[in-house]
């Protein structure tokens, strides 16, 4: 944990790094601990006042490793938020992660999702979807969303 950070974002971002692009943009402006579930061996979230969960969308939901981390490692009552990227927008993309945090009685402070470059399955044959995303506007909107989380936490 960083010496002053009160917020952590637990994430998984693999194929094109779409989600990580958003998180790195945020971390250039604000002190936030980014925890990559694909590299962390033990995750202790007990020292954070707010925890974010971030992922690309895989088969309509957050990556299983992020959902499992929320179930196993999230302290009860800690406010949470979600950030995600998707190839195509569908309903209920945050349902699995929301269900995981609800077991810990955690208030959900909001979510931000945007398009991300996607070459999964048949999309690869046509060169992928959303080639230029996340773009500058997506990054800016992610930062504005994060600023609402900070204001919520401070207020």
Protein language model features and the residues they cover:
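Short N-terminal binding/cap micro-motifs at the start of the first secondary-structure element
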Residues: 16-21
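FMN-binding flavodoxin-like domain, especially the glycine-rich phosphate-binding loop
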Residues: 2-10, 14, 28-35, 47-155
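N-terminal glycine-/serine-/threonine-rich phosphate-binding loop
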Residues: 38
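Short amphipathic alpha-helix with an adjacent loop that forms part of the alpha/beta core around
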Residues: 41-47
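A conserved segment at the C-terminal end of the G1
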Residues: 23-27
